Amino acid sequence: MNITESLGYILANTGRKLTQHLTLKFEPYGITSEQWSVLHWLTVEDAITQRELSKRTEKDPTNITRILDQLERKGWILRKANVEDRRSYLIYVTPSGRDLSQLLFPIEIEVTREIEALLPHGQIEHLKHSLRTISQYMNNTK
């Protein structure tokens, strides 16, 4: 079998291209798609720990720390000491971070619709179901 026909290759390659496309759309706003995904999670649920954010985004803690450092430097989030556990910090979205997330969300929806328009609705739903099944399986193989 040719490597380009491997499911892993196709998934990774497609995911990378989608990430690059979204990052290109976000470039005028000074944020990458990876940074935006974390910022968006925080706008949905503010004041969570880095550890909890890492679990919810399924990103490793080192990667989350790097992304949060970038978001904090840009003034889009704040880290405050957790009064319940002094070893951890709670992450808060600043007003400018919340504004940016709300500005970018329609762009993400537009890109999603653009991609979903390539296939009939039934195929999109089947694809999502299949990808969730694979993702759950991979979660259980750790």
Residue ranges and their predicted role:
Residues 1-29:
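N-terminal leader segment of winged-helix/HTH proteins
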Residues 54:
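The alpha-helix within a helix-turn-helix
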Residues 45-49:
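Short capping segments at the starts of secondary-structure elements
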Residues 122-142:
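C-terminal regulatory/oligomerization modules of transcriptional regulators
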Residues 12, 40-44, 105:
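Short, locally clustered residues in the helix-turn-helix/winged-helix DNA-binding domain
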Residues 50-51, 62, 69, 89:
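Residues within helix-turn-helix
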Residues 19, 69-129:
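Charged, amphipathic alpha-helical coiled-coil/dimerization segments
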Residues 17, 21, 37-40, 99:
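Pre-recognition alpha-helix immediately N-terminal to the DNA-recognition helix
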